[in-house]
């Protein structure tokens, strides 16, 4: 037998939603939909839900299981599962009202707009960008999972950004889609990738819709935001996305030309957080690796790619190619830099063997005898590491290897902190709201420190904790923690 809880609610009848518990026979590979049907049959429960195709093609059966959106016809039910409706107005139980979304689609003119008459011919190469976005089955998993929608009414959400982009990239369409996207909150997206993670059709809305629509907005003069223009100016003039305060990390360390391992610092480690870079050198030295910090490296270009300002990216890629070529491995300590070097650079013809520091160390961590670090810590998954690079287990393996360390998970692993996608600079109120939610999760854990592997997340979480009166909680890069465990002091 397994136990399944279902959130029941009928507006106008029930005062508030409530969970009801059901025990049902366990069957191999039982789907959530099968479980709901069995509950109704066994208990005469009359739970309301939608389903149609049972093949993952219609999208009607989307629900939440243990807080994550799934298709009931495809997801296997878990013992102890809590089944809830997606985050739309409830008609009854798991059945939600989609009319508000459908009305908005009509109001926004989300249909092919063209004055042309007769048959319009379209070349296959001109159809590729829009073709990627035509697989949506309207399950609205993305809307239910998007962290920004919950914090801002300005943002229409990933479903609508995909819809706008589908026509924006269609050469037959004549509407001003990029400007329309900006009006609907195009620059509110943190590019956290949660929508892509839950999409049953694996549509990459941040990469294939939002970032490309932002690039179109920049070309057509509808974007970017003023704060993003300032960052572009800074990168164009200095090669870095942040101001130079004091002596930079790269100019502080000597070159090690014999090494086959290169360290790509990123802007913040070089100009603002040199201690993280120093910790990396010490930690890798303990493992017997001497690392070179190549001169001539500049901003990876991520802030420009995420905000659609592509005209200077090719130059940044070329400068970094010259700086990084010849190494067997490039190590990063910034999630955004790592994701950009791995995923975006190949589109510019640059292939590098890039590893996040946690990937490099995870299989070597048992080689070092560490001293106890008596702290209680949690770990923040940077979006561009967890979803952008698929790195989840490696940081946890490292944390669990440190003697004396008590590691506890956050309530919602992988919850965006709000610092990415140009939101921290362009829409600071959204970043602050998401940061507050992250801080509240951390408050519940009573930890000494939050560990992460992204300087942008690190600084933003630190700011968020201080604003919520939690300034005594440290925010550390995982290298700083390892440096403590390796140190003889």
UniProtKB/Swiss-Prot annotation:
EC number(s) on file: 1.3.4.1
Temperature-dependent activity: Optimum temperature is 75 degrees Celsius.
Residues at which [2Fe-2S] cluster binds: 53, 58, 61, 73
Enzyme class, first EC level, given as a word: oxidoreductase
PROSITE patterns tied to this protein: 2FE2S_FER_1, 2FE2S_FER_2, 4FE4S_FER_1, 4FE4S_FER_2
Subcellular location, record wording: Cytoplasm
UniProt entry tagged with the keyword Nucleotide-binding: no
Gene3D superfamilies, A to Z: 3.10.20.30, Alpha-helical ferredoxin
Binding site for [4Fe-4S] cluster 1: 136, 139, 142, 146
Co-factor note (free text): Binds 1 [2Fe-2S] cluster per subunit. Binds 2 [4Fe-4S] clusters per subunit.
CDD domains named among the record's database cross-references: fer2
Superkingdom to which the source organism belongs: Archaea
InterPro entries referenced in this protein's UniProt entry, alphabetically: 2Fe-2S_ferredoxin-like_sf, 2Fe-2S_ferredoxin-type, 2Fe2S_fd_BS, 4Fe4S_Fe-S-bd, 4Fe4S_Fe_S_CS, Beta-grasp_dom_sf, Cys_rich_dom, Helical_ferredxn
Record domain 4Fe-4S ferredoxin-type: where: 124-158, 178-209
Cellular component annotations (GO), alphabetically ordered: cytoplasm
pH dependence, record text: Optimum pH is7.0.
Subunit description: Subunit B of the heterodimeric fumarate reductase of methanogenic Archaea, composed of subunits A (TfrA) and B (TfrB).
Protein name (record): Fumarate reductase (CoM/CoB) subunit B
Organism per entry: Methanothermobacter marburgensis (strain ATCC BAA-927 / DSM 2133 / JCM 14651 / NBRC 100331 / OCM 82 / Marburg)
